[in-house]
């Protein structure tokens, strides 16, 4: 893949399709006209909330309350560079009293009120969460560990590498609360069927009840150190990508003020497990959100 890319630029796009991936998650297929797109799997774009008339008063209120401008929001690309259309997948954020300082601004609009034909301006493309040439050259196996919408850049990276590079074997550990929360379930199954020797998925579900049919590919509970060592016993030639939730600045600040200790986050737990298994911290590529 060519590491050189164009400078970040603004593009006006049109929503060509809206695909429901999970109850609170949609993929927006974006038509860019004749604009040449130069990006890497794992990159993200940004969208400014100021361009949406429905948010005008809400943006003004939050800016007055915070005393600063509302920044653009970042969304990882679902699409890969070989595909005709650009795509992002948006999971609706929720306001949780005592946890989130302000109600989410843009994701509810994108996930619930975006229709075909709608136009918007995006800015892209950038981000460090990529399978670059150096990492690709030094690895034979790739372990991906993600949770929730952390699958979005992960999916882009995996499908592109499977299609255009024959060297690597990919293993994905993907954690969600319930089965219905799994994003890209059918797409991941199709990739497994198409590349049975190179791609394997293990799902972990943390909140399914006892009536759910768990098996070797659908496990109960959180990602554990034991599971990681089971699916990736040798890290000598393995690249590791981790994408999922971490503690927010607000959560850390609130806990400090109350003198409380935060429970380990998904990102914190997984990185700790990997380090205890002997993976150097600088060998772990990570991207977090919260």
Please report, for each region that a protein language model flagged, where it lies by residue:
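Ferredoxin-reductase
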Residues: 2-118, 177-178, 206-207
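Short, conserved phosphate/pyrophosphate- and ester-handling motifs at nucleotide-, phospho-/glycolipid
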Residues: 42, 150, 245
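A short, basic/flexible loop-to-alpha-helix module at the beginning of a structural domain
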Residues: 124-138
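A phosphate-binding catalytic loop at a beta-strand-loop-alpha-helix junction
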Residues: 141-157
């Amino acid at each position: 893949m060519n590491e050189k890319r164009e400078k970040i630029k603004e593009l006006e796009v049109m929503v060509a399709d809206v695909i429901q991936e999970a109850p609170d998650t949609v993929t927006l297929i974006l038509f860019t006209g004749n604009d040449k797109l130069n990006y890497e799997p794992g990159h993200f774009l940004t969208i400014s909330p100021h361009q949406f008339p429905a948010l005008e008063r809400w943006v003004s209120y939050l800016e007055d309350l915070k005393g600063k401008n509302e920044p653009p929001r970042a969304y990882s690309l679902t699409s890969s560079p070989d595909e005709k259309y650009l795509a992002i997948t948006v999971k609706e954020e929720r306001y949780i009293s005592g946890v989130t300082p302000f109600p989410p601004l843009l994701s509810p609009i994108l996930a619930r009120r975006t229709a075909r034909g709608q136009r918007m301006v995006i800015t892209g493309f950038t981000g460090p969460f990529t399978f670059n040439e150096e990492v690709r050259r030094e690895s034979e196996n790739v372990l991906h560990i993600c949770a929730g919408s952390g699958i979005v850049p992960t999916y882009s990276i995996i499908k592109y590498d499977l299609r255009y590079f024959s060297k690597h074997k990919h293993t994905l550990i993907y954690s969600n609360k319930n089965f219905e929360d799994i994003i890209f379930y059918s797409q991941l199954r199709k990739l497994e069927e198409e590349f049975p020797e190179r791609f394997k998925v293990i799902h972990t579900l943390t909140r399914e009840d006892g009536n759910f049919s768990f098996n070797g590919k659908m496990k109960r509970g959180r990602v554990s150190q034991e599971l990681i060592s089971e699916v990736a016993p040798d890290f000598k030639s393995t690249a590791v990508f981790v994408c999922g939730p971490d503690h927010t600045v607000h959560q850390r600040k609130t806990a400090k003020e109350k003198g409380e200790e935060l429970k380990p986050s998904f990102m914190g737990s997984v990185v700790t497990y990997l380090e205890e298994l002997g993976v150097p911290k600088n060998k772990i590529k990570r991207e977090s959100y919260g």
